[in-house]
Curated annotation (Swiss-Prot):
Signal peptide: 1-20
Entry GO terms, CC: extracellular space
Gene this chain is encoded by: KERA
Main location: secreted
Tissue specificity field: Abundant in cornea and sclera but also found in other tissues.
LRR repeats: 72-93, 96-117, 122-142, 143-164, 167-180, 193-214, 215-235, 238-258, 263-282, 283-304
Source organism per UniProt: Bos taurus
Compartments where located: Secreted, Extracellular space, Extracellular matrix
The protein's name in its UniProt record: Keratocan
PANTHER family (UniProt xref): AGAP008170-PA (PTHR45712), KERATOCAN (PTHR45712:SF13)
Superkingdom to which the source organism belongs: Eukaryota
Gene3D superfamilies (alphabetical): Ribonuclease Inhibitor
Amino acid sequence: MASTICFILWVVFVTDTVWTRSVRQVYEASDPEDWTMHDFDCPRECFCPPSFPTALYCENRGLKEIPAIPSRIWYLYLENNLIETIPEKPFENATQLRWINLNKNKITNYGIEKGALSQLKKLLFLFLEDNELEEVPSPLPRSLEQLQLARNKVSRIPQGTFSNLENLTLLDLQHNKLLDNAFQRDTFKGLKNLMQLNMAKNALRNMPPRLPANTMQVFLDNNSIEGIPENYFNVIPKVAFLRLNHNKLSDAGLPSSGFNVSSILDLQLSHNQLTKVPKISAHLQHLHLDHNKIRNVNVSVICPSTPTTLPVEDSFSYGPHLRYLRLDGNEIKPPIPMDLMTCFRLLQAVII
C-alpha cells in the first residue's frame, strides 16, 4: 500500500514538473509569429503557449491585479507577483480551470471575494503558499483535491470550512501559526477522502482531534507536541506514514501500546525526549529515533512476537518487517545488540 501511495505522489510530482518544463521549452523555441493564434484573448500581461492553449503564464510580472482569464484556460500561473485580492470578475468566464498557482503574493483573507473561488466548479489544485492569509479561505469549490497553504499566517479554521470538501486528498498547512484552539472536534468533518495532512512547523502542543478516517500520511514535525492520547490511532486505521520529529514527546506521553499500529510503515520520532524505544508493530519498516535520550535497547520489549509454530522460512514473511533503524544521537554505545539483529531479520541499515 505504501509503495502505491509513494508511486502515485511521485507520478503526480514528476508529471507536473515535466509538463511545466515542456511549456517553457516551447516558449523558448517557438516562433513569435505563431503566438498570434491565441493573441485575441490572451491577457497582454501574460504568455499563452501556442502548443498548450489551456495554459496561461502570468508569473513574475509584478502584477497587482488578476487579469481576465479566458474560458479555454485550465492551468493558471500567477505566482511571485504583488497580487492582494482575488475578485470574482476575472474568473467569470474561467469555467474550465483545474489548476491555480497564486504562491508568493500578498493575498489576505479580506482580499478574497466570497464567491471568487467557490464559483470554479472544476478546480482541482489551489496553491496559495507564501501569502498573508490568517485563516483557511472559505468557501472553496467542492471539486478541490489539493489545497496548499504553507507559509502563511493561518491561526484560524472557521467552522464548516471543510464540510463540503469531500474530494480533498491533500491539505498542506505547514509553517503557519496554528494553536490547539484552532481545532474543534468536527473541524475535519467532511474530508472523507483526505490522504495527506501536513501541519508541520506550527505551535501545536496536542495532536489534532479526530482526523479523517482515510488519512494515510500525517506530518506534524516541528511543533511542541508533548503526548498522544490513548487509542488516538483508532480513528485513522489507514495511517501509514507518521512524522513527529522535533517535538517534546516523552515516554509518559505515549499510549500504553506505544506505536503498535499495524498500518504504520514509516515512523519518525527524531529529536524528542524519549528515553526508551516505544512498542512498535511487526509491520513497521522504517523507524527514526535519532537524537532522543535513549540509553539502551530492550529488544524483549520492542521485538514484535512471531508465532513459534511458524517454519523458519515463513518467519521472514510473517515476522517483523523493520528494514531501517536510526538510533544515532542518543546515549547508546555500540556494538549493536545481537538479539536486535536476530529479531529484525530484514534489517538493511542500522545507524547508531
